[in-house]
Amino acid sequence: CIRDSLDGESMPLIHAFMETVESFAQEPSRKHALLDAWVSLKYMVHETQAKGAAAPVHAREYAPVYMDVHTFQSSPAGTALREKWIRGARSFLETQFCEYVEQTIASNPLKAQRGGVPSARATAAAFLRVQLRNAEGAWPPTLSRPLDAATQSPLWALVFHLVRMGHIKDALACVQENEDAIQATDASFLAFFKAWVDDPMRHLPRSMRDHWMGEYVTRFRN
């Protein structure tokens, strides 16, 4: 933010740049890409749109941390700032993807069959119907098993898209409700996934990560 020279209130600077970009008379895709860059920055620094906000982002607020390489890379303040930026960037990508999902469903509502209660799981399943089902209504053979018991959509694709949309609690609930189907091939997946969901920065404990990588090497690379 910057200070308004007329009334001393904080001004959301990134939003001002966004409005400037929107006023450009140029090819839409180029303008959209530039606008996305500013929107992602807004999410990363957590700038609010309201003029005179109670907790604005002040000029050079983060500079003491990121201007010193050692502080940025090695101090708790540097870690906290990087994590804040990561959370903001992830939130932007999740929001952007949710918008794409809604646009896709709206473009083909009959095939989507979302139903009257647009829950996160119903929305993800509707998106998968549009994207993956063929003209006969069949799923691709590689995704036809296992299916989510509630939506009859490919379970692993559903879990992935729930995570991609930022609905990780819904993804965990989906895994828990389909535990029996998962146990047959991935007995430890639920424990690993829950540990990942419960960590604020989406990290696995070192012991779990090492075990997971060992299983990956054994199963997929040998």
Named regions from a protein language model:
Residues R3-L162, K169, A173-N222:
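Acidic, serine/proline-rich low-complexity intrinsically disordered regions
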